Amino acid sequence: MKKKFSIVIISVLLLGYLAPFDTLLVGADETTVSEDTAVKTAEADSATEGIESETGSDDETAEEPKEAKEAEASKETTEKEEKAKTEEPASNIKTEINTDKSQLKQTSLKAAVPAGSTYNSLFPDDNLAKKLAVIITGNAAATGNESVDSAALLAISQLDLSGETGNDPTDISNIEGLQYLENLTSLNLSENNISDLAPLKDLVNLVSLNLSSNRTLVNLSGVEDLVNLQELNVSANKALEDISQVASLPVLKEISAQGCNIKTLELKNPAGAVLPELETFYLQENDLTNLTSLAKLPKLKNLYIKGNASLKSLETLNGATKLQLIDASNCTDLETLGDISGLSELEMIQLSGCSKLKEITSLKNLPNLVNITADSCAIEDLGTLNNLPKLQTLVLSDNENLTNITAITDLPQLKTLTLDGCGITSIGTLDNLPKLEKLDLKENQITSISEITDLPRLSYLDVSVNNLTTIGDLKKLPLLEWLNVSSNRLSDVSTLTNFPSLNYINISNNVIRTVGKMTELPSLKEFYAQNNSISDISMIHDMPNLRKVDASNNLITNIGTFDNLPKLQSLDVHSNRITSTSVIHDLPSLETFNAQTNLITNIGTMDNLPDLTYVNLSFNRIPSLAPIGDLPNLETLIVSDNNSYLRSLGTMDGVPKLRILDLQNNYLNYTGTEGNLSSLSDLTNLTELNLRNNVYIDDISGLSTLSRLIYLNLDSNKIEDISALSNLTNLQELTLENNKIENISALSDLENLNKLVVSKNKIIDISPVANMVNRGAIVTASNQTYTLPTVLSYQSSFTIDNPVIWYDGTLLAPSSIGNSGNYKDGKITWTNMTATSSSTLFNFNRLKDGLTFSGTVTQPYKSAAKVTADAEQTYTIGDTISEEQFLKDVNAKSSDGAPVTSDFATVVDLNTFGEYEVTLTSEKDGIQGDSCKVIVKVLHGAPVISADQTISYDKHATITEKQFLEDIHASTDLDTAITTNFSTAVNLNKGGDYTVALNSENEDGVKAETVYVTVTVNKDPAPIISAKTEITYDKFSKKTEAAFLDDIDADTNDGSIVTSNFATAVNLDKAGDYTVTLNSINSDGVAGTPTAIIVHVEKEKIATISTNTAQQYEKYAKINETQFLKDVHASINASPTTAVLESDFETVVKLDVPGTYTVTITATNEDGGVSAPKEVSVIVRKIPAPEITADKEITYPKFDEVSEAEFLNDIHATISDKNVAITSNFSTDVNLNKAGDYTVTLNATNEDGVKATPVEVIVHVQQGERPVITADATISYDKFANITEAKFLEDIHATSSDGQSSTVITSNFQTATNFKTAMSYTVTLNAVNEDGISAEPVAVTVTINKEPAAALKADAEVSYAKNEAVTESDFFKDVHLEGTEAPSTAKATSNFDSVVDRSKTGDYTVTINATNEDGAVSTPIEVIVHIEAESAPVITANAEVKYNKHEQTDERRFLYDSEAKIDEANVEIKTDFAEKVDINKVGTYTVTLTATNEDGQAANPVEVSVIVSDAAAEKVNVKYVDENGSEISAAETLTGNLDETFSIDAKSIAGYKCDATLSGVFSTVEQTVVFHYKAIKPGVVTIKYEDTNGKAVDEDKQITGEVGDDFEAEAQTVSGYSCRAIASGKITEEPQTITFTYSTATPSKKSGEITVQYVDESGKKLADSKKVTGNIDDSYSVEAKAIEGYSVVGDDSAKGVFTEKSQTVTFKYKKNTQVSKDDPKVKGKTNQPSSTDTKLKVDNNSLPATGDTENMILAVLIGFNMLIVASIFLFRKPKTNQ
C-alpha cells in the first residue's frame, strides 16, 4: 500500500499539469479535520486516474462513459473525505515516551516538579491527571493519585489527549501542569472544553498542536511563543474570533481554522515577518470580508476559504505571488474576483456555488493556471480568458445566465470543458483547442453544433437536452468515442458515419426519422435510439464490436439484415411497427431480444443464437411459434398478448433449457389442433408457465411431464379436468381461476403447494385441500358458481339437501338464502315460489385457516301449468261468437302449451243484456292446470246520427247549441241525446269556416259514429292604411316595429292593426336606404292595400378598443382566437358597432411552449374605420399539478386478492390529467392477509415534473379465541452471546394456543436484555393474533453470565520501515492481535509508543496487556518489533519515447510519456531533458533520469532514448461497396505526405456503376473513403434474321446474362438464304439488337478463320482465345475484351478481311499499377457498346479482300466444315433463348 501511494504521489508531482483538477473535491461540511488530507488524497486519485486514461486499458474501458469514471472518482474521493472526518489527520499526535532516562535531568525543567507530587496535585483537572497517569504508568486503572516526577514527564514527546465531544464528563477543561512536559513535540487537545492556553507558552519544542473542537476557546493567547510550531489546528471552535497570536510563529507551515467565527483577520508581527514559512491556510466556513493579511504571507501556496458567505471580492489577495490554489467555493456574496493578475503562480481556483458571481473577467494572463471550476454560479461574462497557456480543465456548469462562450478559444492545453446546465444558445468557434478531450454541453439551448469541428483529440461529446435540429457533419473528430445527442429536436442524423473510434451513440428522445447508413463505425458498442420516429434501422450491420442496440418506441418497419454483428448482446426494438423478425439469426453473442408491442406476423427460424437467454414477443400478431429454431440456452420466452393471432405452438423442441414461458392472453387451441398441449411436454426444465386467458384451452393433459414447474397460471380457460396436475409435485403456486372445474381431488397430494387459487369455478366440495390448509397454505376458492338439477314446485314450495362441503368434510351452512329460504338439519326449504319456471339461489362464504371458500349455488325449479287470459271481454247483443273465437278474443293460453277449454257456450247468452263469468281450464298428462275467470259483458247496439252538413251565420250572431242542433235538423234513430263542441269550436265574432262534431251514446255507453257539420261565419271589408312616406334613423339606433309605426303615424280607417316588414327589411346596423311595406288585416283576415315607406339609416362612428394587458394560459390549453379575445375581455367601447376584433394570437402564441408572447388586437368597421391597436402579453404557464380524486376509504375481506389497478378502480380513483398515471403504495403497504387499517397514498407527477397533492385512502382489511402463551420461566446465556429474539423464543419453547402461523409471539427481549452487562433481566412475552386480540403477557427471567478474561494472541514479531508512520492501533493490526475483538470488552494496551523508536534501526520488545470491564486481566504477551534500514530508491521508465519534430513538450511531459516512476514518496526524479533534447531537430537523444532520497542514497540512473522524427501521414483506405455495404472489389491504399491533398475517381467494376470522385487531406489519423456502387441490371441481346429488304426470315432469339459477360452469336442456316457471320460483344446495362442480313442463296463461298488471343507483356495467356469465321473476302473487325486488373497495350481493336489462310490477332495487356495519389485512375477500355441498339450487318461481297488466295475446292470444304462447327457451337450456347 505504501509503495502504491508513493507512486501516486510521484505521479501527482510529475503530471500536475495533466491531472484533471475538476476531480479535486474538498469536503463540503468538514469541521474537525484538516482539509488538506482529503484534497491530497483526491489529487492522488485524480493523478492515478489520469495515468490510467492516458496509457489506455482493455477494450471494455472504452465503452464506459467518462462521466461514469468521474462519478466513480468522485465517489472514491468522497469516501476518503468521510474517512478523514472520522480519523485524525496526519498531524494528529500519538503518545510517545522516551525511556532513556539517563538523558533527562531535573535541572532542565524551567519549573521544577514539587517533591511528592501526584498527578492529581500537579494537574488540577481531574480528567487530565487521570489520563496522564494511565498513559505514563501504562495502567488503565490508574486514578491519578500515583506519584509523578520530572523524568516521567520529560520522557513524553508525543501526547494524544483528545476528548469525546467537547461536552463529555471525561473531557479536559484545564491544562494547567502541561508546562512540565517540556519535551513535547506533538500535542492533541481536540474535542475538549479548554479556554486558557497559557500553560502551553513554555512548550517551545512543540511542532504540531491540535486544538480543534474546544467550544469555549475564544483566543489563542499562549501559542505566540511556540517558535518551533509547524502545524496548528484550531478548527471547529465556534467561539474563536481572533487568531492574531499566530502571526509571529516563524516556522509555522500549516494552519487549519475552518468552522470558527473569524470575521477579521489581523496578522501583525512588530518584531519581524508575519508567518514567513506558512504554505497552507484552511479558513473555510468563517465570515471573512477582507483577505489583505493573507496577501502578505510570502510562501502561502494553498488557501481554503470555502463558505465565507460575506466575502465579496478576491482582489485583496493580489499580492500573494506564490499562491497556487484558491478554494473559494460557496462564498455566496462573492460578486467579483477583482484584480488578481498578480497571482502568477496560481494553478487552481475553485468557485463552485458562488451564487452572486456574475463574471470571471479577471481570469486571464495567469500563465500557470491549470484548473478553473466555477459551477453553480451566476456567471454571465467570461471575459477574454487570454494567456492561459496551461489551462487543462474549465468547469462552468449550471450557470443559467451564461449564453456567450466565444471567449473559450486559444487554450492550447485545455482537455476538459464542462458547460452543462447553462443558457448557451450558440457555441462559437472553439478555435485552437487542440488537446480538448471532453466537451459537456448538455442541458443548454443550443440549436447548432456545426462549430464542433477540427478537435483532433476530442473523445467525449455530450450535447443532450438542447434545441438541436441537426448535428451537421461533425468533421475532423477522429478520436471521438462517446456521443450523446439525446433529448433534442433532431429529425436527421445521417451524417453519423466514418467515426473509427466511436463506441457509444445516444440519439434517443428526438423526432428522428432518418438515421442514415452509419457506415465506418468499427468501434461502436452501444447504440441508443429509443423514443423517435425512425422507420428504418437496416443500416445496423457490419458492426463487429456492437454490443447493445435500443431502438424502442419508434415507427420502425424495416430492421434490415443484422449481418455481421458478432458481439451483439442486447437488442430492444419494442413498441414499433415491425412485421417480421426473420433476420434474427446468426448472432452468436445475442443474449436478450425484446420485440414486444409490434405488428410481427413472421418470426423466422431464429437459429444460430447460441447465447440467447431472453426473448419477449408479447403484444404482436404472431400466428404460431412453430418457426422457432434451435435456441439451446433460451431460458425465458414471453409471447403473451398476441390475442386472437397466436393459435399454435408448434413442437417447441428447440428450447431444451427454457425455464420461464409466458403465453397468456392468446388463442391457443382455437382450431383444436393444439390438442392437449403435448407440444409443451418436452420442456422438462420449465419452472414457470403462464397460460392465462387462452380461452380455448380445455385439455391440459400434456402438462403432466413438467415435473419441475413451480409456478403455473391457467386462469380464464375452459378447463374441466385437472387430473394431469397430480404429477407436478414441485408446484408452489397454482392459479386455476375462471375455468369450469368441479373436482380438485387431483391436487390433494401436492405437498409443496403453498398458494392455490381456484376462484370462479364450479367447486362445491373443497375437502381435497385439507392437507394444504393444515400445513398453512393459502387457498382462495371464492366466487364459485354451481347449478343444481331442476326441481318441481308443488304448491309453491320445495326442499333440497345442502351439497357444499368444507375442507374438513363437514357441511358448510349457507351464508344467505334467496327468496327467504330456510336452512335446518342440512336441508334448505323454499316456500311461496309462485313463478311457473325460475330459479333461486343460496350463497356460502367462509374464511378460516388461510382458506377462502365462497360462491353461489343456483337451484332451478318449475311449477304446474297455469292458464292465463284477459280479465274481461265485451260483445253486442245479437253477436254470433263460438267458444273458439271467445278463447282467441281473450288471449287464452296454458303455460305448458296444453289446450285451454271453457264453459262459455253454456254460461253466456248473447241475446240478453248483462255480465257473465266464464271459467277457463287446461289439462296435460292427467295434471289439471290452474284455472282462471273471465267476465263477459253483453251490451246494446250503437245509435246513428243524422243532420245537415253545412250552415252559415252572420258575424256577432247569438246562437246556442240547442238552436244550432235545431237549425241543422240533428237527430238519432234511438232518440238518444246528441252532444257537440259548438260552443268551443265556433267563434261567431270572427269570420271563417268552423267544423263542429256531433256525438251520441246509448244507455250501455255504446257510442255512435261521429258526424261533422261545417259552420260558416261571414267576414268584414278590407281596411285602408295611412302613414308618412319616409323617415331617418341613426345607425345602431334601437327601434322596434311598434316605435317605427308610431314614428310614421301609421293607422287604418277601421282600427285594424298595421304591420310591417320593418324588422326584416331594415338593418339599423348598416347604413343605407330601405323600403318598408305596411300591411293590415282585419279580424276576419281580409287584407288592405300595402303601403311603401322609405327608411334612411346613417353611417357609424369609429370605435376604440379596450382589453386586459395580460393573460395567462396553461401549457397545451386548447385556446383559439375567439376564446383568447373573450379571456382578455377585449371589447369595443361603441355598442353596437360593425368593427370586428381581430388578433395575431394563433400565429404568435405557441401553447405547447411555455413563455411570454405579445399579441396585437385590431378592429375595423364595415365603413373602413380603423381602431387604434392594443397589445396583450400572453404567458403560457407550465402544466399545473394534476388533481387526484378518490374514495376516502375502502374495505376488503381478509385474504382477498387485489391488484393495484383493481384497487384504483375500486376507490374510483381519477385524475384531472388523463395523460398522467396514478401510482400508490398499495402493493407494498397493504397486507390483505392481515386485518387492520392501512393508509395508502396516491401520487402522480406530470410531464413537467409537477406533482399532484397526495391523496390518502384508508384501506380496511376485515377481521375470531384469545391466544394463550406458554414458555419456560427461566433461561441463562453467556455474556456477548449472539441471541436473536427468534432464538430466545425457540430456547424457552414459547408457543401460542391457537397454533396460527399469523399469531406471532413477540417480546421485549432485545430492549430488556443487555448481553454486554452480566445480570438477570425480566423479559415479557406478548402475542396478538391476526385479528388484533392480545394474549395475557408472560414473564421470563433471563440471566447473563459474566465475561471471562480475554486470551491474547499475536504474531511473535513484525517489521517496519525506518520512519514509517505507525500508530499503536496499526501495530495491533499488523501483528494480528486477537482476543479483544468484539464482543469482548477487553481493551488492549501496550508500551509500543514508548519502547519503539521508529527513526532508529533496531529490535524492540513490546508488551501487550488487556483488561475487560468485569475486571478480568489477560495474560500479557510480547512481540519483537524490527525497524529496518531504508534502501536506495528505484527508478523505472520506458526505454524510448518518440516525438514529432516541433511537437510541444517539456520535462514534465517527457516524464509522463516515458512513464517514469520511483518507489519512494517525496523523492523527485530529475533529468537532463532540457539540455540534451532539441525537439526542433530530427535525431535520437539519450536522457538520463536520476534521484536521491533524503538520506543521500542515490538511485541507479536510468537512460531513455528520445527519438525526434518528421511527422508521418497515415494511410487512406479506399473501399468499394455495393448498396448493401458489401465489398465488391479489393480495398486499396493511398499514401502521401502530411497535409497533402488526395483525389480518387471511382474505378470501373463489371456489373456496377459509380460516377464519383472523393478527395481529402492526408493527416495523422488513418482515414477510409468508400465508393458506393449501384448494381447494373443487364439488358437483353436480341438476334434478328432479316433479308436485304428488312423482312424477317426466321424467328428472333435472345441472349441473357450478367453485365460484362461475353456473348457470341452466329448467323444460322436459313433455307433459301445465305449469310455467314459471327457477332460478339459484352452484355451491357442497355438492351442491344444484332441483325444478321441474308441474301438470296447463291453457291457456297469459301470461309476464312481468325483466332483472337489475349496475353500479357510476357506472352502469358490471360483469357481463352476466340475464333471468328466469315466468307473469304468479307471484312472483319474484332475488339480487345476487358480483363480485370489489366490495361490494353497499343490498339484495342483490329480490322481486316477473311482469307483462305487462317489468321491470328493478338492483344497484349499490362498489369495495372496500384492506385496512388498521382495516378488514381485505372486505364483501359471497357469495350462496352455505347449504343443501346447495336446492329451488326454483314454484307456479302461488299467488303475489301486481304490475304492469300487458295483454290476454290479447298475453300468450299473448309467453309462447309466451319458451317457445321458453327452450327453446333451456336446451338450449345447455354444462355441463348431459342
UniProtKB/Swiss-Prot annotation:
It is a peptidoglycan-anchor. The modification Pentaglycyl murein peptidoglycan amidated threonine is found at residue 1746. Induction: Expressed in late exponential phase. InterPro entries: Cu-Rt/internalin_Ig-like, Ig-like_fold, Ig_E-set, Inl_IR, InlI_Ig-like, Leu-rich_rpt, Leu-rich_rpt_4, Leu-rich_rpt_typical-subtyp. One of its GO terms (cellular component) is extracellular region. Residues 1725-1742 have a biased composition (Polar residues). A motif (LPXTG sorting signal) lies at residues 1743-1747. Residues 1-28 form the signal peptide. Residues 1747-1778 form a propeptide. PROSITE patterns: GRAM_POS_ANCHORING, LRR. The keyword Signal applies. Residues 1510-1569, 1575-1634, 1644-1705 form the MucBP domain. Pfam families: InlK_D3, LRR_14, LRR_4, LRR_adjacent, MucBP. Disruption phenotype: No visible effect on colonization of host tissue culture cells; no change in organ colonization in mice. LRR repeats lie at residues 155-179, 183-204, 205-227, 228-250, 251-272, 277-298, 299-321, 322-344, 345-367, 368-389, 390-412, 413-434, 435-456, 457-478, 479-500, 501-522, 523-544, 545-566, 567-588, 589-610, 611-632, 633-653, 657-678, 685-707, 708-729, 730-751, 752-773. A role in virulence could not be demonstrated. Belongs to the internalin family. This is Internalin I.
